[in-house]
Amino acid sequence: MSQTVTIQEPRPNDQRIPYQCREVRRAKGGFANRTYDYLYDPLFIVSSERDHAQANIQATLIRSRLKKVPNFRSMFSNLFHHPRYSMYWSKTDPVPLHVTREWRGQEAKHKEVLRLQAAMDTSFQMPKEKDEDPDVSGKNRYKFFDRPFLPFLQQMPLNVVLSPVKTQPLLLTPESSKYAIIPTKSTVATQTDYRDADVQTDPYSPEYVVCQDTIPELLTLANLTWGRGLPAGQAEVEIIERAREKRAWEATLPPLNDSVQAEKRRKMMNAMERKEWAFREGEIEKLQELRLEVLKQLLKRREEDQNELNMRHLNDQWYKLQEAKEAKVAQIRHKHVSDIRKLMGKGKNIEGKLQRRDIISDYSNFASQVYGPLSRLGRFPDNNSEDFVVRNHYLNTYEGLVELESSLPDFVTQPRIKPPKPQIITTKAGFLKRTARMDYELAEVHKALVDKKNKGLEGTKSLRFLQKNPISQARLPTPSLEMTSYEEGEIEMAVIYLQKLLRGRVVQNMMFEGKEKRLELILELRTSHALQEDDKLVKKAEKQVTLALQRQRNLHEDKLSVIENHLGDLEGRVLADMFDFLSKELVRLQEERRIHAFAMLAERQRRMREAEESGRRQVEQKRLQQEDMIFKEVIKVHQSTVTSYLEDIILNTEERTAEEQARKEIEKIAEEINNIAYEMENRRTYLQSEEIVAELVYSFLIPEVQKDFVKEKVRNAQRKHILAAHEIIHSNTETMLEEQVYKELQSEDFELEEEAESLDSEVPTVSVSKTSTIKPTQDEGEG
């Protein structure tokens, strides 16, 4: 028997643990292994540099530096040429640069070589090892503590199991429960390896003494035990009554030694046996009826369970279809809202002009996306906001707020504002103070220094935007006029006049060519614009006619549009009614097909159940027939057993009686023969003894010796013939064996040649060596 003690310890203060860490513990059941233990942990050991590289690869795969950056324009796109996100390689390395990524086994090998060299060379001095962090209060603080092992300090059984601590949500403890409460009670439970049913004993039975030649009726009920017949019921009472009747009937039977009433005894026993068998058959029928009722109940229960399971499957399928339908409707509605929003966005900017972002207006408008970004663009400002929720008694309850307000001083709720005193920079006489003047001069000097510094920086500052570098142009030369004679002036004036004529002619030619080229355009303008009054009147009349025709056309188009609208309305109504009728017909056909399918399934299930029921009925009938046959065979075996038992008893009795009589007769005859032999021995003479000896020698000894001599002579005569026959037989068998071995070797060589040819045909470069056949000679076989 083992005992298990459960000790419930007080729950430790869980407020010091961060909320996020507790959530991780609850979710994962413990902290996961660190990714870069092979670099930081000094206890992390790998066998070789290859394993170190493998650990580095695993850490790189686990801590992938590839990040997905969403594209706000196509965040919800499923198209291949408009991806939702792009991959970005993060430049931030999680491992600092001062941490080496090399295998630490090289340092260990170096230290091992130094140690071996120091062991071999006594003059070699080992370099002193310096601890990387010898500070006691640092990360190595745990190395300076040791807990002694006192095995007998506290007697605690090895199978003590501490009950797990149930985590509770973070609540602010009141002032009265700041310290851990010492429990006044501890629950200690014990558990055994045995059940109550295993240790339950029968009721107490006192000792008893049975008188001689008496059989108490109570002892005949020894087979009834507690739970198996006790406490007694109607069936047990009937069994007891039948046992009493049988004992009374046995008392009325004639005795066995009465040969006169043997036939009567046999008839009474046969009648009782038939009665018992009839009673037994009735019990078997009742038992079978009871089993049949139980089987019917089980079948009914199984059918109910199957129907319930089918209904559950149908309900689950219906719920799944409803959820899929709701999800599809929600998706359609979401897409509808998105499309409407896109259309409204396109309607605001019909021309499709690109507008530059106005940062000032965005930050001045508190309803812009700067202060409230849209979640559909991938910005979730309230993400993980539940981690920063402060659950405080003073903030979440009205009583806490009242208590907090009462505990605050007056200057918090009623602020006291003191106006600042003006700084006096003048004296009573109205002059500026020396300190104020010095401050003013220092401010001027500081401003001059800052301006000078900024000017120097502006000279060396690189230009952000391209600026035009003005290039100084040389000054044009001043025109000068030289005085000429009158004749030269006349000639120059004539030349200038000739040039004017030429230029005018050229311009005239150009105008003519342009008029010829644009003649069609000029004619087109003349059709709509007139310069003369008559032409203007004609054009005005044509314009009025055209406007009248346009008005008539517009009226005709309006009538046609009204007619088309009415026709479209009628067509829409007709189509709506038709589609409604078709959809209802489709639903009706689907329901009809579904009902037909259910009916077919029900019919199929009914047929399968009928087949199973008929099969079970046949199996039951076959089992009943087998039980009847078994019962008949058992009766036959019982009868044959009784018959064989009686036959064996009679035969053994006859054999024993005959053997006793034969033994008595043999003893009597042997006694008579012994008497005769003793009498003859007493009356025999010496000559009669010699005659008896001679008769024994001549009748038994000499014939036996002669018979052995004849047998040996015949054996010697047949020996040479047997040897010759052996030689002939063995020579023939050896030749036959040699021929058989030779044939087998030839068949093996033929098979090897065929395999070699097949291999040569498949792979020409492979050569197969043939085994040489050896034909054994007759001499070798004989040897």
Curated annotation (Swiss-Prot):
Expressed in the testis, in cells involved in spermatogenesis. GO terms for biological process: axonemal central apparatus assembly; cell differentiation; cilium movement; spermatogenesis. The keyword Cytoplasm applies. Phosphorylated by PKA. Residues 764-776 have a biased composition (Polar residues). It comes from the Eukaryota. Residues 748-783 are annotated as: Disordered. Belongs to the CFAP91 family. Part of a complex containing MYCBP, AKAP1 and PRKAR2B. Interacts with MYCBP and AKAP1. Interacts with CFAP61. Pfam families: CFAP91 (PF14738). One of its GO terms (cellular component) is axoneme. The gene is Cfap91. Involved in sperm flagellum axonemal organization and function. May regulate cilium motility through its role in the assembly of the axonemal radial spokes. Residues 748-760 have a biased composition (Acidic residues). Keywords: Cell projection, Cytoplasm, Cytoskeleton, Differentiation, Mitochondrion, Spermatogenesis. It is found in: Cytoplasm; Mitochondrion; Cytoplasm, Cytoskeleton, Cilium axoneme. This is Cilia- and flagella-associated protein 91.
